[in-house]
Amino acid sequence: MEKVKIIGGGLAGSEAAWQLAKRKIPVEIYEMRPIVTTPVHKTEYLAELVCSNSFKSTEITNASGLLKEEMRKLDSLLLRVAEETRVPAGVALAVDRELFSKRVQEILLESPYVTVIREEVKKLPKEGIVIVATGPLTSSDFAEHLMEVLDTDSLYFYDAVSPIIYADSINYEKVFSASRYGKGEETYLNCPMTKEEYERFVEELINAETVESHYPGEEKFFEGCLPIEVLAKRGIDTLRYGPMKPIGLIDPKTGKEPYAVVQLRPENIQKTLYSMVGFQTRLKFQEQRRIFRMIPGLENAEFARYGVMHRNTYFYAPKFLKATLQFIKDERVFFAGQLIGVEGYMESAAMGIVAGINAARLYKGKPLIILPPTTMIGALISYVTTKVPVRYYQPMNANWGILLPLDKPIKDKKLRNRLLAERALRDLEDVIRRFAINV
């Protein structure tokens, strides 16, 4: 029988392999470790966790919890193993990292349908169904090949992501809508600062705690995109002549330009999420929460995701992927994991589940599935396959802001999240039933 080839044995690749093997489809997982090593991997196990050992919340009223519940309904291997290897962490799902990866590998190797081949793949196979899940540390040779297959401008080698804020946590009495010099639509929200507010803000940025790099030599990737806290250290006025410049923005309350301004740009059509323009940062998450809440209008800001800057190979997926996670130019090829622009362990694994299910359905000549954007997995896929200007595309994690809003707005956040979760699971179960996905 022809075998499906999976390039990369990380979280996404392991989930994809499981979905294929349980449907009795032969799989070859190509994993370059330990033949070719990376700066952060410590073992040769599949699904190795290189950073945190936490998979975040299990509560259904949390976006991460909903994502995991959807994955559970799609028979996630990683969640099953996570429960087996769980360590105490309150409502979060944390694991013994070595036991977790070891057990995932054991289960996959126990399957008569799975073969693991320890070698580096440098080019896409020209025949057969292929799932590419090489992750944030894609080898240089394969990355170079991807640049030829995609195009040079669509492959990125680091994240420089500004924080994203839930729209309903912004104090609209303190911000104003305007575009610079009144040109174009007033799509930006502007948070004005006085001289005193600005100088206190800069002082806190200068003294804030930052994240240490996981990857040797990582800093060289950021020379063309400096963190906000590094800019602050270059001089008291650097930020207000850079990303916080007020030029051409008139505060309607004063009729004048503010001393400095923080701009917020809508992240989606529904305007449920706003990103902080030019605020790429390496501040620790608790520092981002503390310092960015000093900004007028953001005193009670809730963060859909925090700013990050780290090594991460990913590409501009909307140009190349269908909602089935197939490559538009060659539909026998699927892409999954962080490579397509999702951020996080479970988010990457969820993409592997969908790629695995659809690869299996393609193999058997069945119609492929597209999960609705009312589900968290479907919303993530919608995010990475919906075209936006390239300069605005950045990796995304599970959060409530990417889901389609409810038909009727609800102010109570807990109630709204519960109703969103109930709708997501109901819609997912409908797809599972209609397509007989778990059969």
Curated annotation (Swiss-Prot):
- Main enzyme class: transferase
Q: Which UniProt keywords apply?
A: Cytoplasm, FAD, Flavoprotein, Methyltransferase, NAD, NADP, Transferase, tRNA processing
A Gene Ontology cellular-component term = cytosol
The Swiss-Prot or TrEMBL record lists the needed cofactor(s) as: FAD
The domain of life for this entry's organism is Bacteria
Pfam family membership, one = GIDA
Q: Does the keyword tRNA processing apply?
A: yes
Molecular function as annotated in GO: flavin adenine dinucleotide binding; tRNA (uracil(54)-C5)-methyltransferase activity, 5,10-methylenetetrahydrofolate-dependent
Q: What is its EC number?
A: 2.1.1.74
Q: What is its main location?
A: cytoplasm
Q: Which residues are involved in binding FAD?
A: 8-13
Reaction(s) catalyzed by this protein? uridine(54) in tRNA + (6R)-5,10-methylene-5,6,7,8-tetrahydrofolate + NADH + H(+) = 5-methyluridine(54) in tRNA + (6S)-5,6,7,8-tetrahydrofolate + NAD(+); uridine(54) in tRNA + (6R)-5,10-methylene-5,6,7,8-tetrahydrofolate + NADPH + H(+) = 5-methyluridine(54) in tRNA + (6S)-5,6,7,8-tetrahydrofolate + NADP(+)
Q: Which InterPro entries match?
A: FAD/NAD-bd_sf (IPR036188), MnmG-rel (IPR002218), MnmG-rel_CS (IPR020595), MnmG_N (IPR040131), TrmFO (IPR004417)
User: What family name appears in the similarity comment?
Assistant: Belongs to the MnmG family. TrmFO subfamily.
User: According to its UniProt entry, what is the function of this protein?
Assistant: Catalyzes the folate-dependent formation of 5-methyl-uridine at position 54 (M-5-U54) in all tRNAs.
Q: What is this protein called?
A: Methylenetetrahydrofolate--tRNA-(uracil-5-)-methyltransferase TrmFO
Q: What is the lineage of its organism?
A: Bacteria, Pseudomonadati, Dictyoglomota, Dictyoglomia, Dictyoglomales
Please state the gene responsible for encoding this protein.
trmFO
